[in-house]
Amino acid sequence: MTSPSTVAANKALVSKVMDAVFVRRDGSIVDRYFAPGYIQHNPAIPNGRDAIPTLISHLAPGFRYEPGMIVAEGDLVMIHGRYTGWGPKPMVAVDIFRVVDGQLVEHWDVLQEEVPAETSASGNPMFSSP
């Protein structure tokens, strides 16, 4: 069983890495926070931590990432976010990471074009704080 302090540290790590990669575009964090055998389940990004600096370098000047809620259980951390400038419409995502010994070892994501609240059946936004 993963201790509550480790779960909290894992959440903080994922938040820090997402900020470094997508907000500050800082590739210097890769060796420290991504495991050498980093497994990537996004079909557009290769396995391995060496793909991260390439990803950063291909972010458009107008690209913007906004973090949302973050939840964790055991060694898994999920962070809700909005990506603007990755395509013609903003994307809302849930990024899921497996963390082992203070490093990201595996990543999955679920991405969807954002539907504005005013055009959704519920009238609720896809991306908001809890």
Map each language-model feature to its residues:
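C-terminal and inter-domain tail/linker signature
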Residues: 1-130
